[in-house]
Amino acid sequence: LIPLGAFAIVWSMEPSIFTKIINGELPCHKIYEDDKTIAFLDIYPIQPGHILVVPKQQIDHLDDLDDDTYAHLFRVVKMLAKRVKLVLGVQRACLTVQGFDVPHAHIQIIPCNQAADFYRIPDRSGKPNDQALGEMARRLATKEVVL
């Protein structure tokens, strides 16, 4: 038997899928990138334009980020949320922080016109639609927003 604490240490050392994206080991439909963060489309979006905003430093819990990275992450989220509303013409850019699927802190931006849009369960049974994701990424990546 492996003590739970030892398992947690070994498990946390594995690069997350987001770290693999950041390192260029896996592809993504990138919306934004700077020295501290990257933002890309969720391949199984709750709604079209569903963005994941991820710190480049792999930390499991958002509240464990250093203050500068935490603040920067939310500045990027604010900018991208405005961009989502402007480009997609939706009423809201809903935010969620869950962290159950990937052990790497991140914030999700989900375009919504009504509350039910936020709660839609995406179909993960098929292959992601790379053509639609690529077009959406181009639309969202090229619009500048002044904060």
Task: Spell out what each predicted region is.
Residues L1-A8:
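Intrinsic disorder/low-complexity segments
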Residues A8-L147:
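HIT superfamily nucleotide-processing domains
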